Amino acid sequence: MSNIYDLANELNRTFRELPEYKAVLESKAAIDADSEAKSLFDDYIAFQGKIQQLMQTGQMPTPELQEEMKSFGEKIQANAIVTEFFTKQQQLSVYLSDIERIVFEPIQDLMK
């Protein structure tokens, strides 16, 4: 039987070979090559971290933060480079969801 860590590392390598993964990498490179897209992306990631911290402490976003979320959504939709990145990332996330379901199935079986 294979070592479980060897299997996990093989999954890591295989995941990186997926066309969808490579498409996300290409989209990220396009963001990095465009100063406007890079600035928007970096600002959004920082804002997203701020919102996650707030939610982890049990707080809800204020109306001002909700308005800022809406504004980011509009800016992202207006920027084709950033929009493409998030579209490609979502396509890749289908694999992650499937893998997560498969990996955690034995743990769920223990709870039955």
UniProtKB/Swiss-Prot annotation:
SUPFAM superfamilies according to UniProt: YheA/YmcA-like
Pfam families registered for this protein in UniProt: Com_YlbF (PF06133)
Listed InterPro entries: Com_YlbF, YheA/YmcA-like_dom_sf
Stated family: Belongs to the UPF0342 family.
Name of the molecule in the record: UPF0342 protein SGO_1370
